């Protein structure tokens, strides 16, 4: 399921992040991938140890927690803290697939934990007219989909998808990206639950008979109980 979720960040929030990232100390993005990825990855990335990365990442996680659509679509169990990248002129990232299992940050005294990447997320931090190229291109069974969204908007898609970032030919593209392990492993099941949840919310808003809504809500939770992993 490819889903555009608008206005995760307000215009003010997105602009503030842009300004702080403009003065950031970026490193070569190839340092974060293996030999295969390094052949096709040409961008900049905030270092893992950057205090700014943690600061902005926490702001994004807070914003995600305020989005009912994001929660309904992802049903998050674990989230890898947001990362940040920058594509300048001639930067690009060829077709690649995200790692299936990723290590979560370890807090002192805690047991190491990992995350299964079910959902890939890209949050755009500057507007499309600020750069040329730089489209996120996602390939699935229906073909290739080009994504280039306003600042503050989020795109989510299954982590099983091959994807790339087209060459930037003018300006600079800044984004945050992260992965989610969902309570529900299968993308088709998540899609069905989102459709059902959306229908329930619509019926509730139209004051449909309470018993009808209750029956549908019961079906939703029973499906979630059947499909979820905790």
UniProtKB/Swiss-Prot annotation:
- Write the protein's name: PKHD-type hydroxylase XF_0598
Entry's Gene Ontology BP terms:
DNA damage response; intracellular iron ion homeostasis
Cross-referenced InterPro entries: Oxoglu/Fe-dep_dioxygenase_dom, PKHD_C, PKHD_hydroxylase, Pro_4_hyd_alph, Pro_4_hyd_alph_FE2OG_OXY
Q: How is the cofactor bound?
A: Binds 1 Fe(2+) ion per subunit.
- UniProt KW Ribonucleoprotein keyword: no
Gene Ontology MF: a single term: L-ascorbic acid binding
Q: Enumerate the spans annotated as Fe2OG dioxygenase domain.
A: 78-182
Coiled-coil annotated residue ranges, if any: none
Between which residues do disulfide bridges form? none
EC number(s) per UniProt? 1.14.11.-
Family annotation (HAMAP family)? Hydroxyl_YbiX (MF_00657)
Q: What cofactor does its activity depend on?
A: Fe(2+); L-ascorbate
Q: Which UniProt keywords apply?
A: Dioxygenase, Iron, Metal-binding, Oxidoreductase, Vitamin C
Q: In which domain of life is the source organism classified?
A: Bacteria
Q: Which residues bind 2-oxoglutarate?
A: 173
Name the residues that bind Fe cation: 96, 98, 163
Q: Which PANTHER family match?
A: PKHD-TYPE HYDROXYLASE YBIX
Pfam families according to UniProt: 2OG-FeII_Oxy_3, PKHD_C
Principal EC category = oxidoreductase
């Amino acid at each position: 399921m490819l889903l555009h979720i608008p206005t995760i960040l307000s215009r003010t929030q997105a602009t503030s992040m842009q300004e702080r990232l403009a003065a950031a100390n970026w490193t070569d993005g190839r340092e974060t991938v293996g030999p295969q990825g390094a052949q096709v990855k040409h961008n900049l990335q905030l270092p893992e140890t950057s205090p700014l990365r943690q600061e902005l990442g926490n702001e994004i996680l807070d914003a995600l927690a305020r989005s009912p659509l994001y929660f309904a679509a992802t049903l998050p169990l674990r989230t890898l803290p947001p990362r940040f990248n920058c594509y300048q002129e001639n930067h690009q990232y060829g077709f690649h697939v995200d790692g299936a299992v990723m290590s979560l940050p370890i807090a002192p005294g805690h047991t190491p934990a990992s995350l299964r990447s079910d959902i890939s997320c890209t949050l755009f931090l500057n507007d499309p007219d600020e750069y040329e190229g730089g489209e996120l291109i996602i390939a699935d069974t229906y073909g290739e989909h080009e994504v280039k969204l306003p600042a503050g908007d989020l795109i989510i898609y299954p982590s099983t998808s091959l994807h790339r970032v087209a060459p930037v030919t003018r300006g600079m593209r800044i984004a945050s990206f992260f992965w989610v392990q969902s309570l529900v492993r299968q993308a088709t099941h998540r899609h069905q639950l989102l459709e059902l949840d959306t229908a329930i919310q619509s019926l509730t808003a139209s004051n449909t008979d309470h018993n009808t809504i209750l029956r549908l809500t019961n079906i939703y939770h029973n499906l979630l109980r059947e499909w979820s992993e905790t």
